[in-house]
Curated annotation (Swiss-Prot):
Organism classification: Bacteria, Bacillati, Bacillota, Clostridia, Eubacteriales
Organism field: Clostridium perfringens (strain ATCC 13124 / DSM 756 / JCM 1290 / NCIMB 6125 / NCTC 8237 / Type A)
Cell compartments where the protein resides: Cytoplasm
CC annotations in GO: cytoplasm
Function in brief: Involved in the regulation of the intracellular balance of NAD and NADP, and is a key enzyme in the biosynthesis of NADP. Catalyzes specifically the phosphorylation on 2'-hydroxyl of the adenosine moiety of NAD to yield NADP.
Protein name in UniProt: NAD kinase
Length: 276
């Protein structure tokens, strides 16, 4: 691999100790022509990133989500996620496994898996499409009253319910907020979407799973409630009356490196169920 980029969550490595270690190890194992350290809030020319053969992301799940949201529309470089954070459910390896991970990449003992992304636009608002690796949440503000929501699938009304909100989740996001709200766990390589009501006050409001090629439209009936759309828990936009949230499968994918010894169920048991 000739060109390698590194993105690090500086809040978790203020003295650059981890960054310097990773640069040293990358040179030792992969001997690249160039190593480019990229700020996670990068505002430069994205053309500079298109030549990367590998992007190493140092942080936790939040850092990976931010990278997916920010860079997925401009580069399709395989990503090696190294956990230096807390949960690290989405990452490829822990920092203690760095040597093994780089060696496996050196000898080609890895695979690149594609993860589904969601695309989100707000009807009635001039804004760019947003991308989400985990979920799009349409929900009331913290101090707001309960709101009512209409959910359409391919422009046909699916349900109307009162509650705190609704989560539109990818398979990757099924282990996040959706899981806490009673949504199903979904194998990450599937191309499906779950629709999960949050604290519904309407009888028989249950999660729904649909094919990823379907389009979802959420119409909050806003009266006295403040309602927001939140992308991967990182970016929030307040909705006004008559705004509708349009959600569909993005044309891009999040491409992450994985190893055969890290099975999905093994990670579930260890990090979600706390079973070794």
């Amino acid at each position: 691999m000739r060109n390698i980029g590194i993105i690090i969550n500086k809040e978790k490595d203020k003295e650059n100790e981890i960054l310097n270690l990773v640069i040293l190890k990358v040179k030792e194992y992969l001997n690249p022509d160039e190593i480019k350290v990229i700020d996670q809030f990068y505002k430069g020319d994205y053309k500079d990133l298109m030549a990367l053969d590998l992007l190493i992301v140092l942080g936790g799940d939040g850092t990976l989500l931010g990278v997916a949201r920010k860079f997925s529309t401009v580069i399709d470089t395989p990503i090696l996620g190294i956990n230096i954070g807390n949960l690290g459910f989405l990452v490829t390896a822990e920092i203690s496994e760095l040597d093994e991970a780089l060696y496996r990449i050196k000898v080609g003992d890895y695979k690149v898996e594609e993860r589904m992304l969601l695309s989100c636009t707000i009807e009635g608002v001039t804004c760019s499409e947003e991308r989400a690796l985990n979920d799009i949440v349409v929900a009331r503000g913290t101090l707001s009253r309960m709101a009512q929501y209409e959910v359409f699938i391919n422009d046909e009304l699916y349900a109307t319910f009162k509650g705190d909100g609704v989560i539109i989740s990818t398979p990757v996001g099924s282990t996040a907020y959706s899981f806490s709200a009673g949504g199903p766990l979904i194998m990450p390589d599937l191309q499906i979407v779950s629709i999960v009501p949050i604290c519904p006050h309407t009888p028989n409001s249950r999660p729904m799973i649909i094919d990823g090629n379907n389009k979802v439209r959420v119409k909050p009936l806003i009266n006295e409630s403040d309602v927001f759309v939140t992308i991967d828990g990182q970016k929030a936009l307040k909705l006004e009356k008559h705004n509708e949230v349009l959600i569909k499968k993005a044309k891009e994918f999040f491409r992450i490196i994985s190893f055969d010894n890290k099975s999905y169920f093994k990670v579930l048991r260890k990090k979600l169920f706390k079973i070794e």
